[in-house]
Design a protein with these regions (language model features):
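Acidic, metal-coordinating helix/loop segments flanking the phosphotransfer/catalytic sites
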Residues: 27-44
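Conserved acidic carboxylate
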Residues: 5
Length: 121
């Protein structure tokens, strides 16, 4: 699982809790950093939208340009995106949220599996 969050305390908090649930977690501080982690082939990406350097929208668009299947993406953000802005997004989770809500969406995303690249649509 890849956690993409610019706020270090939140990023660390998500990672600790998800690791306690048995997930293998890597972290990125922005979209540019997250692109480098894609070769790791995470099962799920938790994506904040408002980040410096490369925001979540830009990261998502660039990821979908890469040929092949992509991990399900769960948008975790205080900004509520419209699904039309992020075609193929697996789920959204508005901040603040209960950790049980995150775990439920992650479990569903892991079961769902990868989605095809934008070129396949």
């Amino acid at each position: 699982m890849l956690v993409v969050e610019d706020v270090a305390d939140l990023r660390d908090f998500y990672a600790i809790l998800l690791r306690e649930e048995g997930y293998d977690v890597a972290c990125a501080c922005d979209g540019s950093d997250a692109l480098r982690w894609l070769s790791w082939r995470p099962d799920v990406i938790l994506l904040d939208l408002m980040m410096p350097v490369m925001n979540g929208y830009e990261f998502y668009a660039k990821m979908r340009e890469i040929p092949g299947d992509h991990p399900p993406v769960i948008v975790v953000s205080a900004v509520a995106p419209m699904r039309a802005e992020l075609p193929g997004i697996h789920a959204t989770l508005p901040k603040p949220f209960e950790f049980s809500q995150l775990l439920s969406r992650v479990a569903t995303a892991v079961t769902h599996g990868p989605t095809p690249s934008a070129a396949a649509f």
